[in-house]
Amino acid sequence: MAELKQLYIFTDGSCLGNPGPGGYGVVMKYKHQQHEIADGFSLTTNNRMELLAPIIALETLYEPCNIILTSDSQYMRQGIMTWIHGWKKKGWITSTKQPVKNVDLWKRLDAVSQLHKIDWHWVKGHAGHIENERCDVLARKAAEAKPQQVDTGYNPE
């Protein structure tokens, strides 16, 4: 079996108002190459953007990879590493017997992450981590750009 390519992915989400206009930012590194992705939505939440960032990054890959994925979102990291197993067993119901919020994105993240070997890392936001700061700028600019794109999965309660 061929050795998997080693990638480093950094992600962040931003929302102005929460809910409000939102965006995500991604920095992907492979060897000496760096690629950035960002996009915005007219109405969404911070948590949805924190989930969408790694989804978009992973969906751009065309082959299985060994990935170190770094985010400042404990919600995303805890969810994909710990909570999701119970949610799936209970039919996407939380421990408090409520439907899992953002289930559309959790299902996408679960599916796309199965294709890769991923180490999920957390970094404190706004603490000077170069790639996290860059993702924050990308996400904020995408949110501030008056995006017209609709987050079809956003469901205000």
Swiss-Prot record:
It is found in: Cytoplasm. Residues 3-144 form the RNase H type-1 domain. GO terms for biological process: DNA replication, removal of RNA primer. Belongs to the RNase H family. Keywords: Cytoplasm, Endonuclease, Hydrolase, Magnesium, Metal-binding, Nuclease. SUPFAM superfamilies: Ribonuclease H-like. Its cofactor is Mg(2+). PANTHER family: RIBONUCLEASE H1. Mg(2+) 2 binds at residues 12, 136. Mg(2+) 1 binds at residues 12, 50, 72. This is Ribonuclease H. It comes from Shewanella frigidimarina (strain NCIMB 400). It catalyses: Endonucleolytic cleavage to 5'-phosphomonoester. Its EC number is 3.1.26.4.
